């Protein structure tokens, strides 16, 4: 069972390799975005609840393998495992089509700091317990690269192995443009109120 749409291709490949049936048990609401990108846990939890609907008849009484592209904070995975168990799944096994996310991304993907990354702070057993899953397994870094058919040097693997290919300033973050805009606006307001005198250099 894939978590749509991010797990569709990996779940299909998993089904073909193992000979297990592929079931689209979750129906996705395409008007809800990626939950891990939302600014608060409350919004993430709400998005996860309304994003997918389950077809219970495909799950009841079965041992289920759920496939997704990643586990970042664990919000989506936990909700999906619980959905499947509530629908009557006898067992739920989680398979992830990438290695564990161990490091934040400083190149534009909104991964939180390391303290908020599930795999960076918990053992596989702890993740399994948190998700209420019967097992959790990740694709290896080598396996992920092999699946692409491209050489490893074509990819940034920093979020998995901590090797950042381009230097970055950790003081800069995704809010840097907003901070700059706020400074410019405050200077503009001060000039408008004659609280600040412009000087020509």
What are these regions (language model features)?
Residues 1-201:
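PRPP-associated nucleotide enzymes
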